[in-house]
Amino acid sequence: MKIHKYDTVIVGAGGAGMRAAIESTKRSRTAVLTKLYPTRSHTGAAQGGMAAALANVEEDNWEWHTFDTVKGGDYLVDQDAAEILAKEAIDAVLDLEKMGLPFNRTPNGTIDQRRFGGHSRNHGEAPVRRSCYAADRTGHMILQTLYQNCVKEGVEFFNEFYVLDQLITEVDGVKKSAGVVAYELATGEIHIFQAKAVIYASGGTGKFFKVTSNAHTLTGDGQAAVYRRGLPLEDMEFFQFHPTGIWRMGILLTEGARGEGGILRNKDGERFMEKYAPVMKDLASRDVVSRSIYTEIREGRGCGPEGDHVYLDLTHLPPEQLDAKLPDITEFARTYLGIEPYTDPIPIQPTAHYAMGGIPTNVEGEVLSDNTTVVPGLYAAGEVACVSVHGANRLGTNSLLDINVFGRRAGIAAAEYSHTADYVELPENPAEFVVEQVERLRNSTGTERVSVLRRELQETMDANVMVFRTEQTIKTAVEKIAELRERYKNVGIQDKGRRFNTDLLEAIELGNLLDLAEVMAVSALARKESRGGHYREDYPNRDDVNFMRHTMAYREVGDDGTESIRLDYKPVVQTRYQPMERKY
């Protein structure tokens, strides 16, 4: 067992983690722990762009962007955070440009911009060109650019170090972050990282769904680590289902395709979004478009022999436009479906895409232990966090913006905290939980298989907690997850070795997914309304009287060791925009 000491430790090396690292390393001795090589992080899969009211192509301003973000989040957005996001967006894009990111350009040389769902001119009058993009590889370009700048700044990376536990020490009645415990995949060794400040930037939770755009590594590791230590998770019932995933595979086809003029059609060739969103049409918010697609399918207007998908039609767009603006998704259509997008429409269906909920933070990235209390030395940014800038539904291109704006803020805040803070004493036997977990799983002779339990979890979530939900479907999910959690106690793995034990890694990840899926389902069951990505067919309307509030879920352990979930609620921060009916 090895012990390391740093001023700041960052968990995760995607966009938020590396943006934080660039700022933190300038101000404090920083280590970045990542279970992947940094450029394999899921930020690289983001395609469409990064929102900022640059007004390079059309009139725009940050206040319109703020309004669209609040409206898009179905008014569950904390508006102070939304204002910061929109105001700082312009500098965030220009910072990346200065770092070397190759944005697409207008003929006069400025950063080009295109339309994206839910982004509008003058508070909803018409779509606006706000998305700054690098073809349909924007996330990839951001990831590469940030990594190059991390290397330039001398950031210390610990690659393939899997953080399994958050260390909390109580000092004078105040719970403080003391560091993290990590498992080194190459050797099987346990490492303790003592740090004055810890930033979680470990990404989302989407692998508890089967049809998902998320990478295999998005298993909620950061959320699970802090949740086990008694800290809350916020708004976990809100999960975004992107309208255009490749049929049956879930691989993302960017919203930028519709921003460039792509059209959604049913089996009759009808542009059906005109019925559901007369102004924004195919560029309505993602929750609206995904529900519209499933409504078409349910009412018998789906495409194909089984009527289980619709079409994304790009055939009316010039091939040179597709090649220049959408090279990756046209290649995806050819590779995965054998379809030529120049001449044939692409079969699509909604895919689980993004967690709006996560570890609750304030606008500086400081983690909260309840509605207002900060955990000294603990920070989070990106999809792992809930600031809450996305509310009940995230707008496209606000994610790449979020990781840059709040990743930067968390990096600065954590480093500055480390200047004045002392190291917190480590708990007695700090690696006890991780050693017990690793050895129990590695030496288990149980009969349950990780792959079987994971498949049953994913099928349960797809069937019961996806775009449309009811009391009965959510209860079915809660009961099935409880059964799977019980069976997980008898899980066995084949590989008993220490080095690169991927069987062990997958077993640990499954445990995280089971914990978080239960939180999501229990939170969804309690929210008896429809709002954004959470749609209850038995409660189809938004209820601002009873549910204009954030859900806070806490893990509680009884004297007999039984676990339960306690739900509490936190008020929404409203500054200038009062809730209205959402129309697109």
Where are these regions (language model features)?
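FAD-site-proximal beta/loop scaffold in flavoenzymes
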Residues: 165-192, 340-387
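An anion/pyrophosphate-binding glycine-rich loop and adjacent beta-alpha core
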Residues: 225, 231-347, 413-419, 454, ...
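Glycine-rich loop(s) and the adjacent beta-strand/alpha-helix scaffold that form part
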Residues: 197-251, 304, 396-413
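Glycine-rich active-site loop/strand segments that organize a redox cofactor
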Residues: 52-85
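N-terminal Rossmann-like FAD-binding beta1-loop-alpha1 element of flavoenzymes
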Residues: 8-32
